[in-house]
Amino acid sequence: MPTQNSHDNGLLAAAEDNIKNLSRRNFLGYIGGASALLLTAAACKKSDTPSTSKGVDLGSKDTGILNYAYALEQIEAAFYTKVFESPYAGITAAESARLGDIRDHEISHREFFKNALGTSAIISLTLDFSTINFGTRDGVLSTAKAFEDLGVSAYNGAGHLLASADYLLLAGKIVSVEARHAAYIRDLIAPGSFADGLDMNGLEMSRTPIEVLAIAASYIKNKINASNLPTS
């Protein structure tokens, strides 16, 4: 784990001010402020700023994995925001409340990574949801299920690629929230179907960054360059 110097301490103070603007109830409440500040201090290094010469370069090492997570959180946050621009026909008050909570969680995740990465963060992606039917319950919930499952499998598949124990702890806490989202969406579609997200060994699905980005590419107009991400 990197040692903290005076520069890092300054970053911690600045990060605390930035993160106060995020939703503590929805995010910092379950990941812990101290870990969040450590993430900010270690990640905000100008030398790690991704290049855009060959598409949106996620970067390398832990910064690359954090940008990978940030890209996925951008998709999820934008999707749930779009859901509430014109809620599907027949949405109940209970569904609206719970989906609204998920939206707020995803926005908090997105803004957390953006603030934590600082100058190393990738750009805001241009997304394309034209293939999604936002007007029907089935269209929204089936897509929500797909996105939540993708997010869970992404965090599960990338955890071992992180060198920092602090980052790994954060990823584990975030994926637990994503898994709860996935379970709730499944229960909306078919009560009691939460186990559908497990593999034959009873474990949650896992995908590599390349596998995840191949699926996510359908909704991203930007070219994503993941060539510098760690693979082991």
Label the model's feature ranges.
Residues 26-45:
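N-terminal export signals
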